[in-house]
């Protein structure tokens, strides 16, 4: 990825018109799951979503579909959004040999702003957890990016 952190990537998506910020109040369930499933159906060019007003949480934000379209994937690589898919894959392969990279330690990392300490921590009180699909056995904190292809295509 061409960015040092999620914040700078989200800013790049916003600058390219690929981040839809939603400030209306939503419920973690079912609204966030419905939004996640809807973005998958939009098709080519679906934006990333940012929710910052989640019922029951004072300072929680959720972002999803950050690399759920080829435009967003291109932006994540620091390429123009209209970069052809083959060129994106070629660029990804070219960069592969540079990984893994050594972690960079910082005196005051940005994630420290959102740290909770203690012995009695309940994630349901802190995070707007939601199930993505009916029948999910539990709640997911993240979901990986998977670029795949049908072997018969």
Label each PLM-derived region with a short phrase:
Residues 1-152:
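Extended, highly charged
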């Amino acid at each position: 990825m061409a960015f040092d952190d999620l914040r700078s990537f989200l800013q790049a998506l916003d600058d390219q018109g690929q981040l839809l910020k939603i400030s209306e109040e939503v419920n973690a369930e079912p609204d966030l799951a419905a939004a996640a499933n809807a973005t998958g159906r939009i098709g080519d060019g679906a934006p990333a979503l940012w929710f910052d007003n989640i019922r029951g949480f004072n300072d929680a934000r959720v972002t999803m579909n950050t690399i759920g379209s080829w435009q967003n994937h291109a932006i994540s690589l620091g390429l123009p959004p209209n970069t052809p898919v083959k060129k994106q894959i070629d660029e990804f392969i070219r960069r592969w040999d540079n990984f893994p990279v050594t972690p960079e330690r910082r005196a005051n990392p940005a994630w420290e702003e959102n740290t909770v300490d203690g012995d009695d921590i309940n994630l349901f009180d802190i995070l707007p957890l939601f199930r993505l699909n009916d029948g999910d056995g539990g709640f997911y904190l993240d979901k990986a990016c998977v670029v795949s292809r049908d072997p018969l295509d």
